[in-house]
Each structure stands twice: as C-alpha cells, then as structure tokens.
A protein has these predicted regions:
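Flexible loop/hinge segments that line or gate small-molecule binding clefts
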Residues: 104-149, 160, 167, 258-273, ...
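Hydrophobic alpha-helical segments within soluble ligand-binding/sensing domains
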Residues: 82, 142-168, 210-212, 259-263, ...
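Hydrophobic alpha-helical
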Residues: 99-116, 187, 199-200, 204-265
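N-terminal secretory signal peptides and thylakoid transit peptides that target proteins
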Residues: 1-16
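Short, solvent-exposed amphipathic alpha-helices that sit
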Residues: 47-62, 150-154, 178-197, 210, ...
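C-terminal segment of N-terminal export signals and the immediately downstream linker at the start
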Residues: 1, 22-36
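Extracytoplasmic "Venus flytrap"
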Residues: 35-54, 58, 62, 69-83, ...
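Hinge/cleft segment of the Venus flytrap/periplasmic-binding protein
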Residues: 31-33, 171, 175, 179, ...
C-alpha cells in the first residue's frame, strides 16, 4: 500500500513542479464537493510517504464527504514549488489546505493569500512562524508534537550514557524550519542540564548526504566527541556511516528523530541509540480531521483552536 501511495504522490509532485498539478486535478472534482489538499515536503522522505499513505487511507472512509489531493516537493528545500502549489490550489477553489511547510517564514505570504481567498489552512509537522503570522494578523493552527519536548526527551536519555563534561554535536534540520529550531533548542537544553559540552552545531537539512558530511566534519574537528544528536533519522543514518568511516563505531552515540522504518536495523544493532516516534500518520489524519471539522461546521479561520498537540514516544535501541 505504501508503495502504491508513494507512486501516486510522486506523480502529483512531478506535475506540480511542472506547474500542471491543480488545474488538471480540479477538472475531476465534482462541483460543490469539499476538497482538501495535503501539501507536503520531500516525497523522498519515508516520513512524508507515511503521512501521504495515512491521509489517503483516511479519505477512503469519508469519500462521500470530501476529495483529497496529496502533493509534495522533490526536496526538503523546494520552497518555490510549494508556494506555487498553494497558489494553484487557491486558483482551483480548494476548500482547505493542510500544509507541512518547507520554510516556516517563506510560506506565510502565500498562506495569507489562501486565507484571504476563503481557504481554511492548517499547518502540520512544522509550524508557521508566529511573528510573521502576527505581522499579518493571521492565525494558523498547528497540528503536531512539541518538538522541543521530543528533543529534550532524547537528549535526557543520551545524557544517561555520558559523563558530565563530555563533548556532543548537534546536526540540525533545515534551519528556517521552526520544528528544526525547536529540536535544536531541546537538544541544547538537555545537554546544558546534564553538564555536557555542545562543541558543534551544523545543519544537515534533513538529508542523509548532508547529515553524513556534517558528522564527518565534527568528528574530524572534535576527536573527543561522544555523541551526535540528529534532528531526523535520515541525518542519523548519514552520521552512522560517517562514524564508521572515521573508525569510531562504538565510541560515539548517535540519535535520530521520526522512527522511520528504515532505521530499525540500526536501532536493533545499537548503531543508533534512540529515536523519537512522532507518529507521522496521526499528524496527517488529525490535520485533515481539523480541516474537515472546520469546513463542515463553517468555523472561521480566526476561530480555530491554535494548537492540537499530537503524541511523541522515545524509541530506544533494543525496544521491540
């Protein structure tokens, strides 16, 4: 099922990149039926695929109530394409947009255009920048976990494996994303509380390659490094390979974030110490549910509950 879903969303993403997506999809939407669009980040990320799959399964149970368009970008940083997607969805008279922003600030202007056009907008996974929203007198609900709390939880666990004064590095996500910023804040808070030394912080943009490169640089510059706290599992996987190439396997703890299925072997082997499950499927479904409820109850954007917090769970090496 996941593979079928991935093929469908990849096709949608490719059409969007060509500027063809919503105009074509809109032709197939029955007149008067509610339409909800799920606009995601990189379709190459298993976390995004899990969101897409869950959303489409959810829609099947409520097909008489609404149609669902699932769109996504080719990379984590493809903000221009995501902005174009939202503009196209406005033009297609979409009822609601559930958005996982590629950039917490850069998406705010197009979100404002959507709201001003009468489209309900909900943010999931990555909250929009509060100051940018406030400047435009907008409110966009965030459906998702407390990223700082999740990062603190995993940081606290790592600290139990370390000695006070040990050196650690942090590999961040996309630095313009609020969720990445919150995870870095949480990692730092946990390390400070435990008396560890954060000797390096570098972005890995949520990708394997950049996570590996950031880890390699930290390992070369800080030979006494004892842990690498990574803001997602893709970067943690890259860090595992960087540690192996540096002949440091077993002496550097590595953590991830998301609990993607791909890292289960690394957790089982102990190469990744722990990750955080933020339940991608639930985030997508809860976001759509909030949008659908707003539409059916005709709730105004400004009257929507600003935060719907979703669960987190620490997943440790050896857990079954």
């Amino acid at each position: 099922m996941v593979q079928k879903t991935r093929r469908r969303v990849l096709v949608a993403g490719a059409l969007a990149a060509a500027g063809l997506t919503v105009a074509k999809i809109a032709e197939a939407i029955p007149t008067g039926k509610l339409t909800i669009a799920l606009v995601l980040k990189s379709l190459a990320d298993p976390f995004t695929v899990a969101m897409a799959s869950a959303a489409q399964n959810y829609q099947k149970h409520f097909a008489s109530q609404f149609d669902l368009n699932v769109l996504g970008t080719s990379t984590e940083l493809d903000t221009a394409t995501q902005i174009r997607m939202v503009d196209d969805l406005i033009g297609a008279h979409t009822s609601a947009i559930v958005l996982a922003p590629t950039d917490s600030k850069a998406l705010v202007p197009v979100v404002a255009r959507a709201i001003n056009a009468g489209v309900i907008v909900i943010a999931i996974d990555n909250p929009l920048d509060e100051a940018a929203l406030d400047a435009l007198h907008l409110s966009v609900p965030f459906v998702g976990p407390d990223n700082r709390k999740g990062a603190e939880t995993i940081g606290d666990y790592v600290a139990t494996k370390l000695a006070r004064g040990d050196e650690v590095g942090i590999i961040e996500g996309v630095t313009t994303d609020r969720n990445a910023q919150q995870r870095t804040e949480g990692f730092k808070a946990a390390m400070d509380a435990a008396g560890m030394k954060v000797v390096a912080v570098a972005p890995g943009d949520y990708t394997y390659a950049k996570g590996k490169a950031a880890a390699a640089t930290m390992l070369a510059q800080h030979p006494r490094l004892r842990a690498l706290l990574c803001a997602n599992d893709n970067m943690a996987t890259g860090a595992v390979d960087a540690v192996r190439l540096a002949h440091r396997t077993g002496s550097v703890y590595i953590t991830g974030y998301n609990n993607n299925p791909d890292i289960r072997p690394l957790l089982n082997s102990g190469k990744i110490l722990a990750t955080v499950d933020q339940f991608a499927a639930r985030q997508a479904v809860f976001g759509i549910d909030v949008a659908l409820k707003a539409l059916t109850e005709m709730t105004r954007q400004e009257d929507l509950t600003p935060l719907v917090e979703t669960p987190l769970q620490l997943v440790k090496s050896g857990d079954r």
